[in-house]
Amino acid sequence: MPEQFAVPRSVEWEETSVKILNQQKLPEKTEYLHLTTKEDIYDAIQTLKVRGAPAIGITAAFGLALCAQSIDTSDVSAFLRELRKIKDELNQARPTAVNLSWALNRLLKSAEGAKSVNEAKTNLVHEAIQIQVEDEETCRQIGQNALHLFKSGDSIMTICNAGSIATSRYGTALSPFYLAKTKDLDLHIYACETRPVLQGARLTAWELMQGGIDVTLITDSMAAHTMKEKNISAVIVGADRIARNGDTANKIGTFGLAILAKAFQIPFFIAAPLSTFDVSISCGDDIPIEERDPDEVRRINGTQIAPQEVPVFNPAFDITPHDLISGIITEKGIITDRFEEEIEALFSAEALT
C-alpha cells in the first residue's frame, strides 16, 4: 500500500465487536461505531452506515461470526439451526446487493463441516477474515486490470461510491485511480453527486481527496454537458448485482450515464468482483430493486426541500442493460463481448479451481 493512501478502512474485526466507519457522518465527521449485536449489524447495513456491495458482505460476515460466539449450546445441530436463523435475518437488511447473501452463505458453509461448536465458531471467524483479505487483493487486481484502459491526461466520470470505503481497500471503480497515482499516471475524475443520498458528493469526493486523487464534483444533471465540454474519455462505475447476461444493477443514475456515454460514443465500464455476479438469474428483470424512505428525496441532511405530502418514487438502484456496457472489469480480466458466454465460461473455470 502506498504511503500516501490515507483512506481509513470501512470495516474491521475486533474480538468483541465489528468496527465500522460511519459513512452517514462523512464528510463532516470521521466517526467509528462498534457493533456488538445482530440488531446493530442489521441497522448499520440497512441505514447505510456501511454501504457498498463488498463492504456490506464483509460486515455481514463479521456480524454472523460475532453473533455465533453468543450461541449457547454444545450441540452442533442446534448451533447450526440458530446460526441459519441469524443468517436469514441479516440477509434481509438490503435486497439488491448480492454480496450480502454470498458472504453469509459462504460463512454458513464453513461452519457446516465442523465437528464441534467451538470448531464452528473458530471457522466462522477465520472465514470472515479471509473474505476481507481476499477482497483487498481482488480490488487491487481489478484496478490493475483496468489501468491499461486509460492513459495519462484522461478525464473519467463515475457515480456513487465504488471506492475504498465501499470495500476492504482500493475499491472497484476507483481502484485504478489509486494505482495510477503510484505509477505517475495523471487521471482526472469527475464525480456525480448521486442524489438522493449524495454518495458521490459525501463519499467519493471525500475519499479521493483523502487519497490525493484529482477529483471534480458535479451534480447529476451536469453529466451530459460535462461529457461534451470536458472531453470525458470513459465512464467507470461499480455494481451491486450482475445477471448472467451482463445486465447490471448499480446506484440509481447509472443507467442514465450509460445512455449518455453511448450518445457521446464514450466507453462505459463496470468494475466488480466475481462475488457480485448472480449467475442464478438470467437478466436484469430478475434483480429486486430496493425502494427507500421517501424522506431521502424530500430532505437533504435533515432540511426539508419538498412538501412533506408529495408522493415520492425512490428506487435505490437501476438496471443498465448489457448492450450499453463496453466491458465488465473483474479480478480475472475484462469481459468485453458475448457477455453471457464469457460469464458462463468464467464461472465454469472458477468451479474447477
Curated annotation (Swiss-Prot):
Keywords: Amino-acid biosynthesis, Isomerase, Methionine biosynthesis. Pathway: Amino-acid biosynthesis; L-methionine biosynthesis via salvage pathway; L-methionine from S-methyl-5-thio-alpha-D-ribose 1-phosphate: step 1/6. The active site is at D240 (proton donor). The keyword Isomerase applies. One of its GO terms (molecular function) is S-methyl-5-thioribose-1-phosphate isomerase activity. InterPro entries: IF-2B-related (IPR000649), IF-M1Pi (IPR005251), IF_2B-like_C (IPR042529), Initiation_fac_2B_a/b/d (IPR011559), M1Pi_N (IPR027363), NagB/RpiA_transferase-like (IPR037171). It comes from the Bacteria. The keyword Cell division does not apply. Substrate binds at R51, G52, A53, R94, Q199, N250, K251. Gene3D superfamilies: translation initiation factor eif-2b, domain 1, Translation initiation factor eif-2b, domain 2. Transmembrane segments: none annotated. Catalyzes the interconversion of methylthioribose-1-phosphate (MTR-1-P) into methylthioribulose-1-phosphate (MTRu-1-P). Homodimer. NCBIfam families: eIF-2B_rel, PRK05720.1, salvage_mtnA. Belongs to the eIF-2B alpha/beta/delta subunits family. MtnA subfamily. This is Methylthioribose-1-phosphate isomerase. It comes from Bacillus licheniformis (strain ATCC 14580 / DSM 13 / JCM 2505 / CCUG 7422 / NBRC 12200 / NCIMB 9375 / NCTC 10341 / NRRL NRS-1264 / Gibson 46). The lineage of its organism: Bacteria, Bacillati, Bacillota, Bacilli, Bacillales. The gene is mtnA.
